[in-house]
Amino acid sequence: MKMEASVRLRALAIAVTSGVMLLVPLGGIVSLGGIALAAPASPSPASDPAGSSIITIGDSVMLGARWVLEKDGIEVVDAVKNRQASAGSGLLKKRGSNLPMNVVVHLGTNGTFTADDCRAMIAAAGPTRRVFFLTLAVPRPWEAKNNAVIRNCVAANPGRAFVIDWNASVEQHPKWVYSDGTHLRPAGAKGYSRMIEQAVAAAP
């Protein structure tokens, strides 16, 4: 039983596609080595000291999950309304050596997310830290382009940057968000927090 559980954990919603480490939440269907796997459902994790190794940087979407992120042990949740992706690198630079090992970014909801924005955030995080970028679920003209930028940027920075596919999660769980297709209902906030913690734990 222990071995079976260990295998399931290692199979935790990780798919390698075109050089991109793609992380999606439990309960989803993922492709691993060409084989479709249905990841088992899992309850929200209990508060964990590992959360202190994570900082999250985001906008109003992340702000809607702040109460769960903090409850689940993530000590630093830096999220404000209307934040643009261009602000990300400056926020990371201000924290400097105080940044934890894992940086989670959810920006681009409110406008353009450029390749320069992405590269600047990875550089600002420093060479020893991992940066996780959530894809966007925002029914606006810039959604597809921003998500493509995120995926391409991550593919160009293997081992340092990772994609957490929030867009796919919202497609799978449309009731996680309100009628605007973007902001989180309580169930979505819980799924959002769980997804981030599991992605960080599963990344190599």
Pin down the residues of each PLM region.
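Catalytic phosphate/metal-binding cores of nucleic-acid and nucleotide-processing enzymes, i.e., regions
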Residues: 47, 98-100, 167-168, 184
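N-terminal secretory signal peptides that target proteins for export/translocation
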Residues: 1-7
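Catalytic His-Asp segment of secreted/periplasmic serine-dependent ester chemistry enzymes
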Residues: 143-204
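C-terminal region of N-terminal signal peptides and the immediate post-cleavage residues
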Residues: 23-50
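Hydrophobic/aromatic beta-strand patches that form the interior of the parallel beta-sheet core
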Residues: 55-57, 132, 162-164
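Sec-dependent N-terminal signal peptides
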Residues: 8-30
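A short helix->loop->beta-strand "cap" motif at the edges of active sites that frequently abuts
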Residues: 127-131
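Conserved SGNH/GDSL esterase-like catalytic core that processes O-acyl groups on lipids
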Residues: 48-120, 138-145
